Amino acid sequence: MADNKANKEQVHRVFQNISKKYDRLNNIISFEQHKVWRKRVMKDMGVRKGMKALDVCCGTGDWTIALSKAVGSTGEVTGIDFSENMLEVGKEKTASMENVKLVHGDAMELPFEDNSFDYVTIGFGLRNVPDYLVALKEMNRVLKPGGMVVCLETSQPTLPVFKQMYALYFKFVMPIFGKLFAKSKEEYEWLQQSTFNFPGKEELKRMFEEADFINVRVRSFTGGVAAMHLGYKEKDNTKGD
């Protein structure tokens, strides 16, 4: 528990400090591929108008904005993040969107009732949560029966060429970007370590299943440097018609 608390405090400091530069940093580190990946994921999701969505670890709101457009004026999107500064940037970006609400909170203790949302997403945020499984179980709890959960995250490439390129990128290139944008060694080291240490796609799929998601499928992007995990909460078949 002490390690988790220290971890959470460190992550909070990092994102409080890089909030104003986060979008630019994300574009540079991913070579803007995160936008391409998210568009593909949104296509796979097939979000319907009028639905309620929750974007966990919403950060500055990029996925929240995409969901807002997808659910339309009759739908609702809630974004939640534990960094107040990241949320401030997100509020500026979503100021004109009447169907968006951004709230401050913890992914491991979501402040929502059970069975509240049709979709729950988390993009490039799960790796920053101290306990992945706890967060996934919370996402399951607030998802409606039959609802969809989607995670878009960095992953560990399996193809030999991409594995070598990935290792070289994290050893030599990412530290340079980190030093340019981060204020301290702690910040850029965290960005590097959290990504490199994140579970591979098969291990994460097992976690989804352990969190009681069903029909979990995985889709890799760009040689496996990122992956989508999409699953569902089991429908409640105990109720009659």
Swiss-Prot record:
Molecular function via GO: demethylmenaquinone methyltransferase activity
Enzyme class, spelled out: transferase
Enzyme Commission no: 2.1.1.163
Pathway assignment: Quinol/quinone metabolism; menaquinone biosynthesis; menaquinol from 1,4-dihydroxy-2-naphthoate: step 2/2
Sorted UniProt keywords: Menaquinone biosynthesis, Methyltransferase, S-adenosyl-L-methionine, Transferase
Domain of life of the source: Bacteria
One Pfam family matching this protein: Ubie_methyltran
Protein purpose: Methyltransferase required for the conversion of demethylmenaquinol (DMKH2) to menaquinol (MKH2).
Protein name: Demethylmenaquinone methyltransferase
Lineage, uppermost ranks: Bacteria, Bacillati, Bacillota, Bacilli, Bacillales
